A protein has these predicted regions:
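A short beta-strand-turn-helix
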Residues: 40-61, 84-85
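Short pre-active-site segment immediately N-terminal to redox-active cysteine/selenocysteine motifs
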Residues: 59-61, 66-69, 101
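Conserved redox-active cysteine motifs that mediate thiol-disulfide chemistry
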Residues: 65-82
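Short, internal strand/loop/helix patches
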Residues: 111-154
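N-terminal targeting signals for export/organelle localization
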Residues: 1-38, 184-185
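Loop/turn elements at helix/coil->beta-strand transitions in domains of secreted/extracellular proteins
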Residues: 58-61, 89-95, 124-127, 147, ...
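Thiol-based oxidoreductase modules, predominantly thioredoxin-like and allied folds used
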Residues: 91-107, 122-134
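Thiol-/selenol-based redox modules, centered on thioredoxin-like
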Residues: 145-185
Length: 185
């Protein structure tokens, strides 16, 4: 076997070793892209109830992850308070969650945040408030953005992702209209 043959054999051995060394216990990346089934992570509502993203199936849901200290989250919540009636009449439930640990910054509790920025609309039964688990936070916000939202169809598939809500509201409302028109509401 010449040098070329030995080199080819060495490459084959290295590729084989690398392929066989992949751990089957390594965490898998869970897709949060459009079309994917939303990963089933947990959160705690302000009423103290543990819930999962999977438990939201059955109707379209806007899952919005926020930090309670960011100004665009404040403005987005105020804007969403003006649209909650429209979203509810379209069959969309809103779940607004504080990112775990408020991404390491100090901000008001999600309950105080809701009252301050959503006002009376914070008590709307079509708007659930809570705190994301650490795993939900890292799964849905791996880049550590101050806010990000996901529109889920009634079967729990992600149909739209964007941020920040205050400046992308028209896109969100358009996505809701398309979801409703397509019979996924």
């Amino acid at each position: 076997m010449g040098v070329a043959g030995a080199l080819v054999a060495a490459v084959i051995v290295v590729v084989g070793v690398l392929a066989s060394s992949k751990s089957t216990s390594a965490p898998t990346t869970r897709s949060t892209g459009v079309g994917a089934l939303a990963p089933n992570e947990t959160f705690t509502t302000t009423a103290g109830r543990q819930a999962t993203i999977g438990s939201l199936r059955g109707r379209p849901t806007l899952v919005w992850l926020v930090t309670t200290w960011c100004s665009s989250c404040h403005a987005g919540t105020e804007a969403l308070a003006g649209e909650i009636g429209h979203l509810a009449s379209s069959g969309v439930h809103v779940v607004e969650l504080e990112l775990a640990g408020d991404l390491g910054q100090s901000g008001p509790s999600i309950t105080a945040f809701a009252r301050q920025y959503a006002g009376a609309a914070s008590a709307n039964p079509d708007w659930t408030w809570g705190v994301a688990s650490s795993r939900l936070t890292t799964t849905y916000d791996p880049a550590g953005e101050l806010e990000i939202y996901y529109l889920l169809d009634s079967s729990g598939h992600i149909s739209y992702v964007n941020s920040p809500l205050v400046s992308t509201m028209s896109g969100l409302l358009g996505a809701v209209a398309r979801l409703t028109a397509n019979g996924h509401a």
